């Protein structure tokens, strides 16, 4: 009798374990057909890829290292960003301040929205000393320009403000000489109603 009860208990335990295994399996399995390869790019995605590559190549490959040690290249990068905003049908402006006796420029443009709140989308365009800065941060600037082109001429709920910041790398990083710090201080002084800030930083290339 005890032997039968033990055998029955074992069968019940096995059935319970099997039930929970089936629950786990059905919960974890993905429905539908598995796709092992990426979907082909659309024509718009192919064009976007080409623009991103071209902008990174322009900043890192053609202009190269851009910081106060390479001041001419820093200004060339600022001119390129300003021109890219203009070619997208936007109206860029320079937020200029002086550092080490030299004029440094944050480049901004905006798409006015129906409400006064502002969303800032930013990326720094200077590179660390000794580097052409393809990933850090030509990749972020390329994305910034792509977003500006994408939203240009389209209605927006909140104002979209695109800003390319200067002097974010050491020795200015986390100091009051950073372009973004100078810019934020100016926004506060003006009373800008900034509701969010999105930083595009080192996103790969």
Label the predicted regions.
Residues 1-7:
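N-terminal Lys/Arg-rich, disordered targeting/topogenic segments
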Residues 128-205:
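Acidic/histidine-rich catalytic neighborhood of metal-dependent amide-processing enzymes
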Residues 45-52, 67-78, 118, 133-141, ...:
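Solvent-exposed, acidic/flexible segments
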Residues 43, 57-114:
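A non-catalytic alpha/beta surface segment that caps or lines the substrate-entry region
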Residues 26-76, 126:
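N-terminal capping segment at the start of a domain
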Residues 58, 106-110, 118-124, 159-165, ...:
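Soluble periplasmic/extracytoplasmic beta-strand elements of cell-envelope proteins
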Residues 10-27:
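Hydrophobic membrane-insertion alpha-helices, especially the h-region
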Residues 51-54, 58, 76-87, 92, ...:
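Extracytoplasmic/secreted proteins, especially bacterial periplasmic and envelope-associated proteins
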